């Protein structure tokens, strides 16, 4: 099957039919050309004209089935700072390490990294290891540190 556009999103329009999922790594959401297999074994070639993909995008809808995109469940940390000081220290340390993060409500989400637990303990911030489907790609902003 070949698809080249998004026809809707599950969060806005829940299909009443069977949903076949295409699972992507979070960094594949920005890719325009992909070849994937749904969780029901259907081959799908994705060639997007412009935009990338978003969690829940519907790529195909037939009489009895819809094909939608979701990200893979992956290990992550959810960090819950209790004060602005904890938030500031956590944000500083994550930024200093160039660790991409997502902030939703009062929580910070980062992909699992075995070195981060020690950092969170040192800061004294509340955190837990969990699994999460990241709904959007992390944004990397490359730059160089100059020490003259």
Curated annotation (Swiss-Prot):
It holds the Pfam family UreE_N. It comes from Halalkalibacterium halodurans (strain ATCC BAA-125 / DSM 18197 / FERM 7344 / JCM 9153 / C-125). Belongs to the UreE family. GO terms for cellular component: cytoplasm. Disulfide bonds: none annotated. InterPro entries: UreE, UreE_C_dom, UreE_N, UreE_N_sf. This is Urease accessory protein UreE. GO terms for biological process: protein folding; protein-containing complex assembly; urea metabolic process. One of its GO terms (molecular function) is nickel cation binding.
